[in-house]
Amino acid sequence: MTVDPIHQFEIKRYVDLLNFGGVQFSFTNAALFMFGIVAIIFFFLTFATRGRTLVPGRAQSAAEMSYEFIAKMVRDSAGSEGMVFFPLVFSLFTFVLVSNVVGLIPYTFTVTAHLIVTAAMALLVIGTVIVYGFVRHGTHFLHLFVPSGVPAFLLPFLVVIEVVSFLSRPISLSLRLFANMLAGHIALKVFAFFVVGLASAGVVGWFGATLPFFMIVALYALELLVAMLQAYVFAVLTSIYLNDAIHPGH
C-alpha cells in the first residue's frame, strides 16, 4: 500500500465554467466545501436566532456566546470604534473555525490547508486596514510607519523596518493557519496508514497497531484544539491589525 498523505489536499475539478484569457475557471471540491461551510454557518445562525427567548436554548446560547466572544475580542483589541469591523472579524472567525472542524471529518476537504485560501483572507484583512486607514486619516495613516520619540538619524532605518513588518503581516497570517492545518492532517494520515498496514499483518499486527491507533485518537483531540486555537489566533491578529487603521499613531 502506497502512503500518500498529500492526496487529501488535491483540488478536483467538477464542472468547467469558462475560459477567460487562457485561464480556466472551474467549480472544484474546494469551492463546493467553501459554499457548504458558508451554508452551515448561515443556517445555524438563522436557526439559532429565530424565535429568540429570554431563556435561551442551546443553539441560541451558542450563537450569543459566539457573538459576545468576538465582540469582546474586538473591543479589547481596537476599542469601541473597532466594532465597525465586527462583521468582518466574526465572519472570518466562524469561517476558519467551521472549515478547520469540518476538515477533521474523514473524507472531507480542508480548505484552510490551502495557501491560496488563507492568503486571500489575509490580503482581505490587510487591504481593509490600508483602505480604511487612508479613507479615515488620509496621509496621517502613514504615521503608522513613523515611531515617535526616536532620534532623527535612526528614523529612516526604523521606517524601513516598520514597512517591512507591515508587509509581512499577510504572509505570517496566512502561513500560520495553512502550515498548522497541513501538518496536522498529514500526521493524522500517516498514523492512519500505520494502523491499516499493521492490522493487515494478522494477530501480531493488531497488537502492533494498538499504539498508533491511540496516537491517532490523541492527535485528533490535539487537532480539534488546534482547529479552535487557530481560528482564535486569526481573529485576534485581525482585530489587532484593524486597530492600526483606527489608531495609526504609535
Swiss-Prot record:
Q: Which Pfam families match?
A: ATP-synt_A
Keywords for this protein: ATP synthesis, Cell inner membrane, Cell membrane, CF(0), Hydrogen ion transport, Ion transport, Membrane, Transmembrane, Transmembrane helix, Transport
InterPro entries documented for this protein: ATP_synth_F0_asu (IPR000568), ATP_synth_F0_asu_AS (IPR023011), ATP_synth_F0_asu_bact/mt (IPR045083), F0_ATP_A_sf (IPR035908)
Subcellular location(s) per record: Cell inner membrane
Q: How does it sit in the membrane?
A: Multi-pass membrane protein
**UniProt key word Transmembrane helix:** yes
The GO terms this record gives for MF are:
proton-transporting ATP synthase activity, rotational mechanism
Record field: transmembrane? 27-47, 85-105, 115-135, 141-161, 181-201, 223-243
Can you list the GO cellular component terms from the UniProt entry?
A: plasma membrane; proton-transporting ATP synthase complex
Q: In UniProt terms, what function does this protein have?
A: Key component of the proton channel; it plays a direct role in the translocation of protons across the membrane.
Give the record's family classification. Belongs to the ATPase A chain family.
Query: Subunit structure, briefly?
Result: F-type ATPases have 2 components, CF(1) - the catalytic core - and CF(0) - the membrane proton channel. CF(1) has five subunits: alpha(3), beta(3), gamma(1), delta(1), epsilon(1). CF(0) has three main subunits: a(1), b(2) and c(9-12). The alpha and beta chains form an alternating ring which encloses part of the gamma chain. CF(1) is attached to CF(0) by a central stalk formed by the gamma and epsilon chains, while a peripheral stalk is formed by the delta and b chains.
- State the protein's name: ATP synthase subunit a
* Protein source organism: Xanthobacter autotrophicus (strain ATCC BAA-1158 / Py2)
Task: Report which gene this protein is encoded by.
Answer: atpB
